[in-house]
Amino acid sequence: MEKNENLTLRECLLGDRAFYRHVLMVVLPIIVQNTLTNVVALLDNVMVGQVGTLPMSGVAVVGQLLFVYNLAIWGSTSGAGIFGAQFYGRGDMEGVRHTFRFKLLVSTAITAAAIVLFLAAGTPLIEAYISADTSPADAAATLGYAQGYLRIMLVGLIPFGLTQCYAGTLRESGQTVLPMKASMLAMVVNFVFNALLIFGLGPFPRLGVAGAAIATVLSRFVELGIVVVGAHRSTERYPFLQGVYRSFAIPRTLVKSIFIRSMPLLVNEMMWGSGQAVLLQCYSVRGIQAVAALNICNTIAQIFNEVFLSLGNATAIVVGQELGADRLTGARRTAWRMLTLSLASCVVMGTALAVCAPFIPRIYNTEESIRLLATELIRMAALCMPLYGFATCEYFTLRSGGKTFITFLFDSCFTWVVSVPMAYCLSRFTGLNIVVIYLFVNGMDIIKCAIGFVLVKKGVWVRNIVKE
């Protein structure tokens, strides 16, 4: 075991070439994959927007609801992934197999529960986002678009959950290229069939919003097929997949350990995701225009956010592997370097987003007032990006050492205790502009950054959990 030594300021801020080369090898495929995913999401959004503002708003509402499911899957698989990264760092392939099996079982259960929930309560959930000020005709049309889109998208939950199990395990072992290739090919399929089915090009029918949903579901099955076939054809590269389906037995002690650390993470992701859904609902009381503008803002900002989000995922991988190998000082050094890198990247990407803010909304076929509102919201998102990036990297650092209860308090509790009450009060009891409300709510992340800085500095997360 490496001695836990003090670090110099320079060691914390700057790495050597080997460090940046290693981080680049891990993070670049993730950035490419996720950025392309979000570019295609933007193109999807624009194509749906060509149909009209109401279809775009209906799709945005369903997207926010499904986002909670996505986070539940990510939370459940990431909890096991903490162990997977450390098992891989220790060279324990059987341990990685067990964590993969755990992911499959839990994600299947979550997917089944989500499908039942959305079939039973999808309509009232959608209606909560339609402002009382919306005309009856517009409200009925938005609801109809959203219901049709949701029903088709539920089919895509099955391949999505399975893909996350495979892709997450591959990334935890440092193998990020195959998930990237699968995602890129799936995005091509998604884009092509979006164009064909939304607008009815060639012999294909004009399906509008339903066509967008069908294209997305089809692309998810393509992505799953590529990842599964590619991974099982190269088991010498992915040895943890050898014999992985011979049994689903997982040692009870490991299941207990994963549950102890996974449950706070799963609850955190679901509470954070539902918190984001409630925030959108708070903003939606200002009218359907606010929902449309926020949809444009979030879709565009997400492309630029992928740099710090990918660096956060890379932090969990590289720091987790250091902890699993018992290089505790190396883990601390790596964490501080990743925080510095994330903050610097956010300054650059935030500036780029602010520069692009007046131009990108113009590709949408919507009212000029919505474009102008989206531009102002994008500028606020750009201003807050360094806060988002620093807090995200702190979150993944704490999580890498298994401190999932602390991350639960740090992330979702903050959302529900600070962000949601502020958005609720400001949107309902003040006459503040939606842009000002958005800035106040997101600017509160500076408190989260300060709390995370103290926790990372104290080193409460520096633990090898697979040795315990």
What are these regions (language model features)?
Residues 77, 152-171, 179-187, 212-228, ...:
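Short runs within selected transmembrane alpha-helices of multi-pass transporters and secretion channels
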Residues 1-27, 84-156, 204-262, 319-384, ...:
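Short alpha-helical transmembrane segments in multi-pass integral membrane proteins
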Residues 56-116, 160-179, 280, 291-357, ...:
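Small-residue-rich hydrophobic transmembrane alpha-helices
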Residues 53-64, 146, 150, 213, ...:
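Small-residue hotspots at the loop-to-helix junctions and early N-terminal turns
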Residues 25-44, 152, 186, 219-223, ...:
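Transmembrane helical elements of multi-pass membrane transporters/channels
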Residues 35, 39-57, 126-140, 198-207, ...:
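Helix-terminus/linker motif at the lipid-water interface of multi-pass membrane proteins
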Residues 32, 44-48, 59, 84-89, ...:
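Hydrophobic/aromatic residues within transmembrane alpha-helices of membrane transport systems
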Residues 31, 35, 39, 43, ...:
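Generic alpha-helical transmembrane segments of integral inner-membrane proteins
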